[in-house]
Design a protein with these regions (language model features):
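C-terminal segments of large proteins
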Residues: 1-215
Length: 215
């Protein structure tokens, strides 16, 4: 049996939307509780909040009653110097009609959305300050002097038993060599990636055509 005519329209596939996550601060301390503003494309919605730092470190289920809400997340000193927070939500929205416009007379279609943000937690509490006070401000070639060294923690409290290495170098030699003293905290606390790869099977969901959904 052969039938002539146009090809039937394909069923549209499900497409994800974007969730906007806005951290309340540019930087946090390890003892803070981060407030994250969530701007969702639909509500109500069920969601899964994941904290990522070289893998999953925390998973929490959330429910959004409104499109705009705030999620509280207690931080940890194990998350230095940063973590990635991702929110994946699912729900239902109005189905489009044949003209591509939302039609409330049709059954709702499934919907999903996701978004991520980075929370910076610099290791400031683990940094030390060294104050150098020379006995003499100027010296002649071959002269000698004494130098007082004071080590303080991030709260400006003196640190006892600290080990120091002091080097006296001609500043002009360093300038010619282009030497720049590196920050040791950046060496020991480099920026961490999420370390997680997501696969979304909902992208394979085929939606009913509007003419089919009416029956």
């Amino acid at each position: 049996l052969w039938v002539l005519g146009e090809d039937p329209p394909e069923n549209p596939t499900l497409r994800g939307s974007k969730v906007q996550l806005v951290p309340g601060k540019r930087e946090y301390r390890p003892t803070d509780t981060a407030g994250i503003l969530v701007v969702a494309p639909f509500a109500p919605a069920e969601g899964l909040l994941t904290v990522r730092r070289d893998g999953l470190v925390k998973i929490e289920r959330v429910r959004l009653e409104r499109r705009s809400s705030t999620i509280k997340l207690p931080l940890s000193d194990r998350w230095l110097p940063n973590v990635t927070v991702e929110l994946d939500i699912v729900g239902a929205v109005a189905r489009d009609n044949e003209r591509g416009e939302p039609d409330l007379s049709l059954p709702k279609r499934p919907a999903f959305a996701s978004g991520a943000a980075t929370l910076k937690i610099p290791p400031k509490d683990r940094s030390l300050s060294v104050r150098i006070t020379p006995e003499k401000k100027e010296l002649s070639p071959g002269g000698k002097t004494r130098v007082a060294l004071q080590v303080s923690d991030s709260s400006a409290h003196p640190v006892s038993g600290a080990s120091l290495a002091m080097v006296a170098v001609d500043e002009s030699v360093l300038a010619l060599a282009g030497y720049d003293l590196p920050d040791p905290l950046e060496v020991f606390y480099p920026t961490r990636g999420a370390g997680v790869r997501d696969y979304e099977t909902r992208l394979n969901v085929a939606l009913m055509r509007p003419d089919t959904a009416r029956h």
